[in-house]
Amino acid sequence: NKGCSQILCKADEIEKVVHDIDQRIRQEHFAGDIFPTNVAPIIEKSEHGLKLDVCKWGYPLSQGKNLVINARAESVMDKPSFRNGILYHRILIPASGFYEWNRLKEKNTFSRYDAPVLYMAGFCDWFENERRFVIMTTAANESMIKVHDRMPLILEKGQLKDWFDDRKMEQILHQVPVQLKREAEYEQQSLFL
């Protein structure tokens, strides 16, 4: 488990950032939990700003069924398989939150304290006529470290366009994400014992 392996998505708040949302995308792809291999909503650069599209989560590995679902911010530029995506096909993955499991396989939900949507940095590329994406991860901050040593690279709302700017990308790759709110199912269950 390398960090961020399931995300939760709801549409309403994303419409405030991306004005031109295809209603078909809205109905089909904001259904709740999204897993690797699922099609997920993504935000990408367009002529008029930012636009919403969909993309399948996970780069296929050549030897079989396994997928690469995350890319480390610290080493992404050194990996030939990621180079084209990070340089030319950066995207944002909007989500209401994401799930992470601790060493005891207990599920934790992470979301923002201050906003209903978090924006994860990522990139995509083409594999046999199909576009696929990965989510960028970075070292866990204080809000995450007790559960996992990695976390998604989360951008602030004011940085969304910066992610598509080659001059600002490198700085974003090294930033520490915002502190997140954690809700743990196992802690909630224990209240009712």
Question: What are these model-derived regions, one by one?
Answer:
Residues 1-193:
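Short linear sequence motif anchored by a di-proline
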